Amino acid sequence: MQRHSNQRLAHLVFSRACITVLLLAFALLIPAACAQTYDLSTLPAYPADADKPQIHGVIRIHGTELTQHLIHLWEDGFLKQHPLVRFGDYMLPSGFSGLTAGTADINVMGHTAWRSDLTAFEGAFGYDPFEVMFATGGFNLRKGNTPAAIIFVNRDNPLTGLTIKQLDGIFGAERSGGWIGTRWSTASARPASENIRTWGQLGLTGEWKDQPIHLYGIDATLSNWSELIQRVVFKGGDKWNPAMNEIVRGGVEVPADAQIVSSVATDKYGIGFNLMRVVEKNPGVKPLAIAANPDGPYVVPSSRSCYDRSYPLVNAVYLYINRKPGTPIEPTLKQFLIYTLSREGQQAVVEDGMFIPLNPEADARELQKLQ
């Protein structure tokens, strides 16, 4: 559905006002301790009137239902600064094609772009789309999305943590290489001898030593977590341990996430990946700390370790534009991107409640990319 900001209809304004009132009313029910989790005071404020350029034009944004509310918050805040700018929005289940077809200026994704999207774009233009991380994925937010991948085991398992290399050995398989964007690299190849299939290979002794590791996870063919694990753990590879019990989302009796967690809770030798707000509800399992390097440190998954991005399996959400390498970003578009990364833009991320705002270091890196 297209929304033209230069023709704000009365019923749309009324609807937004009603939604705002309802959100404010709900916020009153939330304990004060949860009202403000992140300190945004060190993020750069959007420039004052005297310091920002006077711009106008139309920005066409493609997004999804998951990002629609956040996009509207950004637009409303930006229009207060630049009233001559207009927006055209299209909210689609999969909207990356708009960037490739030239019908969108910005694509706001609830995840990183799939390789098929990148391949199509590169085929059309000969270079990769320009990527900006605008928030960190959720952790255990009430309506959070794109959450970190939590690795968990049965509560009786003596393990407390695993390294990324060990996770590769457990969940992965022999591979000849991996994808870096749309390019295949043999740098991430590994032999079958690095597979980890028993608990004894992780140093467990006694009754655990010769027991096989039972894997549980979401269908590895297409999911946000699967993509994250392939990118971070498998170094771009896409070969999984064929023994994994893949549970497909869409079941009518028990949600797949709950099935995965309950399976590990009843399987002493099980291990799985899922989101924290499901894992923490089941006392039969425990999350593991994860280390990016063999010598540590091991980082416990938490809201704080996701915010500072020290947890190795933290997720993120991105927006994309068509920027030819070595060329400047169109001024109106650049100002909107700056706004999304400003203190005001990141406050909108907090208000939206889907994602975690960027920490100052991550925010500064993304702003630098716009120069």
Which ranges hold each PLM region?
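Intrinsically disordered, low-complexity repeat segments enriched in small/polar residues
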Residues: L9, L22-L23, A33, G88
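N-terminal secretory signal peptides that target proteins for export/translocation
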Residues: M1-F14
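Hydrophobic alpha-helical segments, principally membrane-spanning helices and signal/leader peptides
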Residues: S15-R16, T327
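Bacterial N-terminal signal peptides
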Residues: R16-P31
